[in-house]
From Swiss-Prot:
The gene is groEL. One of its GO terms (molecular function) is unfolded protein binding. This is Chaperonin GroEL. It catalyses: ATP + H2O + a folded polypeptide = ADP + phosphate + an unfolded polypeptide. Its EC number is 5.6.1.7. ATP binds at residues 29-32, 86-90, 413, 492. One of its GO terms (biological process) is protein refolding. Forms a cylinder of 14 subunits composed of two heptameric rings stacked back-to-back. Interacts with the co-chaperonin GroES. Belongs to the chaperonin (HSP60) family.
């Protein structure tokens, strides 16, 4: 296909337009008085939401070059969401400020590479200072505060704190939709392991990049499945029992994987393929744990069994299976309580007998997976639109709470970034590198400015007051007062603030040194779509 190419100043103009279009849409959601954005859906009511990364993911611009700018800033939000679960709007606001300030200086004759070096040195110093300023989470009340701020609801804050109190900071917590009107919590048998779906084609929720399987039938094997010949007889048997199939295998490859994907896309069956956790003997043991939890049996090479020997009794069952690219959670397996209890006793005995610290750790992980179970938070509401918005807030609150426990907390409301600014005074740089540091200084005020602006205040006035306040003091936009942010319960997880700054600067540096863009020339009369292929397999 023929390409269109632009250079120099045209590149900066196009990228800036794309960055500004996306950032201006998202930044209105920042802070406790931020405004939601309505996203059109192809069917049904629009989704009204104030989650920055969800809004950003929905934006595609018609101009190919402007869209590149938007997609790069979207990447900053997505990386922050993946790392910390929150801070996505902050990362977009910071990226926009860094890019716009850098472009002004480039237009005035600054060298992009030297600006980039200055920005990198400033961000490295700020990250170190943020870690120094961070304080560990102390007690349940601070967990309530973190979850309340991110979830924008005290009920969500108390809910997350109560659940984490019961399952522990490393416990498995899942969030699902409910037919009720409020929040409900339950604790069920379940396990989570560090393997995700084999192919993204199995995703059922593109927004969260997750595959969710209700009333799942589970086939477990330590075999590698490569050909249709070995898969098809088993598949035909299972389809007579259930159309919701989860395959947990050493691997599914080549022809077999292609067959599953094609049938999934055609709607012939609802399927998810996941790699089995662990390796060697540990993999066999974990598959056996899974089989006991779900009431099935492992189709094992050691037992001389092939896939075509599968029977209904071999299949495990669970109320729900959720898988992303990294993890899979089995919820409410239908295994016998007595069998699970006996398996836990067996693992305990192995822990006592082993002399290897590594083996003991892995056995304890298996024991925790069977003993701990899974906490389920069911989110309900009067309408589907409200329910999805609530669910997104609960997910963000949970992710932010885990981040706070891991790296500690800072004063919230953008104050943590402003408190770290003095560390830049120690950087003795010259020329364009010093200008790069100044660009970062200007960008760091933007989160506070936009929190205040969205609350109907003059953002610049609020920023000046916060800068001249004691360390840890900032602006409470919810109550329109200044004071000690920690005492007012306004705190941010250090990981969220650090990730937002790190990812915003990374994307900004990429944008400011880019000097040419290449895109396809769009056909004004595109070809009609291919007709759907008939038949199964």
């Amino acid at each position: 296909m023929a390409k269109q190419i632009i250079f120099g100043e045209k590149v900066r103009v196009s990228l800036k337009k794309g960055v500004d279009t996306l950032a201006n849409t998202v930044r209105v959601t920042l802070g406790p008085k931020g405004h939601p954005v309505a996203l059109e859906r192809k069917w049904g009511a629009p989704t009204v939401i104030d989650d920055g990364v969800t809004i950003a993911r929905d934006i595609e611009l018609p101009d190919a070059f402007e869209n590149m700018g938007a997609q790069l800033v979207k990447e900053a939000a997505t990386r922050t969401s993946d790392a910390a679960g929150d801070g996505t709007t902050t990362s977009i606001v910071l990226a926009q400020a860094l890019i716009n300030e850098a472009f002004k200086n480039i237009a005035a004759g600054a060298e992009p590479i030297n600006l980039k070096r200055g920005i990198e040195k400033a961000v490295a110093a700020l990250k170190a200072q943020l870690r120094k300023n961070s304080t560990p989470v102390k007690g349940k009340q601070q967990i309530v505060q973190v979850a309340t701020i991110t979830g924008k609801d005290p009920e969500i804050g108390n809910l997350i704190a109560d659940v984490m109190d019961k399952v522990g900071k490393d416990g498995v917590i899942t969030i699902e939709e409910s037919r009720g009107l409020r929040y409900e919590t339950s604790y069920v048998e379940g396990m989570q392991f560090d393997r995700g779906y084999i192919s993204a084609y199995f995703v059922t929720d593109p927004g969260r990049m997750e595959s969710i399987m209700e009333d799942a039938t589970i086939l477990m094997t330590d075999r590698k499945i490569e050909t249709v010949a070995e898969l098809l007889p088993a598949l035909e048997k299972i389809l007579q029992i259930s159309k919701n199939l989860v395959i947990v295998a050493e691997n599914v490859e080549a022809e077999a994987l292609a067959t599953l994907v094609v049938n999934k896309l055609r709607g012939n069956l609802n399927i998810l393929a996941v790699k089995a956790p662990g390796y060697g003997d540990r993999q066999k043991a974990m598959l056996e744990d899974m089989a006991i939890l779900t009431g099935g049996h492992v189709i094992s090479k050691e037992a001389g069994r092939k896939l075509d020997s599968v029977t209904e009794a071999d299949l495990g069952h669970a109320r729900r299976v959720v898988s992303n690219k990294d993890k899979t959670t089995i919820i409410d397996g239908e295994g016998s309580a007595e069998a699970i209890k006996n398996r836990i006793k067996q693992i305990k005995a192995q822990i006592e007998e082993t002399e290897s610290a590594f083996d003991r750790e892995k056995l304890q992980e298996r024991q925790a997976a069977l003993v701990g179970g899974v906490a389920v938070i069911a989110v309900g509401a009067a309408t589907e639109t409200e329910m999805k918005e609530r669910k997104a807030r609960v997910e963000d609150a949970l992710a932010a709470t885990r981040a706070a426990i891991e790296e500690g907390i800072l004063p919230g409301g953008g104050t943590g970034l402003l408190n770290a600014l003095p560390c830049l005074d120690a950087l003795k740089l010259e020329g364009d590198e010093a200008t790069g540091v100044s660009i970062v200084r200007k960008a760091l005020i933007e989160p506070v400015r936009w929190i205040a602006t969205n609350a109907g205040k003059d953002g610049n006035v609020i920023v000046d007051k916060v800068k001249n306040s004691p360390v840890g003091h900032g602006y409470n936009a919810e109550k329109d007062v200044f004071g000690d942010m920690a005492e007012m319960g306004i705190i941010d997880p250090t990981m969220v603030v650090r990730s937002a700054l790190e990812n915003a600067s990374s994307i900004a540096n990429m944008v400011l040194i880019t000097d040419s863009l290449v895109a396809d020339i769009q056909d004004k009369n595109p070809a009609p779509p291919m007709p759907e292929a008939p038949g199964m397999y």
